């Protein structure tokens, strides 16, 4: 994994996040809180274990994983998923699977910013983070 992903990132823009959360099945109350949250994401690495910690006024979450190995994840909206993160073409690609559903979260670096594309069925959300 490129060390360029490592560090602290702050959300600066978000498009279609409410629609994405609806597609995930997130209720109105949780969506309202999620839309207000301006998360900070901290990506670190120790050996071959990558940790992504997301901190916000809504909820803090943390996942630690090895590339290509499935792990159990409890998401900020309390979904229990089987997740796998891979690296391809300079992008960190995360797939979450639960109850017959699947969503993808792709992270890539563009002009020094981390662009995160979240997809569920035909709904796509784009969130942009700047390094702090």
From Swiss-Prot:
Q: Which UniProt keywords apply?
A: Acetylation, Cytoplasm, Disulfide bond, Lipid-binding, Transport
Q: What PROSITE patterns does this protein's entry cite?
A: FABP
Residues binding hexadecanoate, per UniProt: 107, 127-129
Residues at which (9Z)-octadecenoate binds: 107, 127-129
From the Swiss-Prot or TrEMBL record, state where the protein is found. Cytoplasm
Domain of life from the UniProt record = Eukaryota
Disulfide linkages recorded for this protein, renumbered to the chain, are 118-125
Tell me the SUPFAM superfamilies matching this sequence: Lipocalins (SSF50814)
Pfam (any one)? Lipocalin
**An example Gene Ontology molecular-function term:** fatty acid binding
One Gene Ontology term from the biological process aspect of the record: fatty acid transport
Residue(s) carrying N-acetylserine: 2
Could you tell me in which tissues this protein is expressed?
Detected in spinal cord (at protein level).
Q: Which GO terms describe its cellular component?
A: cytosol; nucleus
Entry remark concerning the domains of this protein: Forms a beta-barrel structure that accommodates hydrophobic ligands in its interior.
General remark: P2 protein and myelin basic protein together constitute a major fraction of peripheral nervous system myelin protein.
Please state which protein family the record places this protein in. Answer: Belongs to the calycin superfamily. Fatty-acid binding protein (FABP) family.
| Known role | May play a role in lipid transport protein in Schwann cells. May bind cholesterol.
Q: Which PANTHER family match?
A: FATTY ACID BINDING PROTEIN
Oligomeric form and interacting partners: Monomer.
From the Swiss-Prot or TrEMBL record, give the protein name: Myelin P2 protein
Gene that specifies this protein: PMP2
């Amino acid at each position: 994994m490129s060390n360029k992903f490592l560090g602290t990132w702050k959300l600066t823009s978000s498009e279609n996040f409410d629609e994405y959360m609806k597609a995930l099945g997130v209720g109105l109350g949780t969506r309202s809180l999620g839309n207000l949250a301006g998360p900070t994401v901290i990506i670190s690495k120790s050996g071959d274990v990558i940790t992504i910690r997301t901190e916000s006024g809504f909820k803090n979450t943390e996942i630690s994983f090895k590339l290509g190995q499935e792990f159990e994840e409890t998401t900020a909206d309390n979904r229990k998923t089987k997740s796998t993160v891979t690296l391809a073409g300079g992008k960190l690609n995360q797939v979450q699977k639960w109850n017959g559903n699947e969503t993808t979260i792709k992270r890539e670096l563009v002009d020094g910013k981390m662009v995160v594309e979240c997809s569920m069925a035909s709904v796509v959300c784009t969130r942009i983070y700047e390094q702090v």
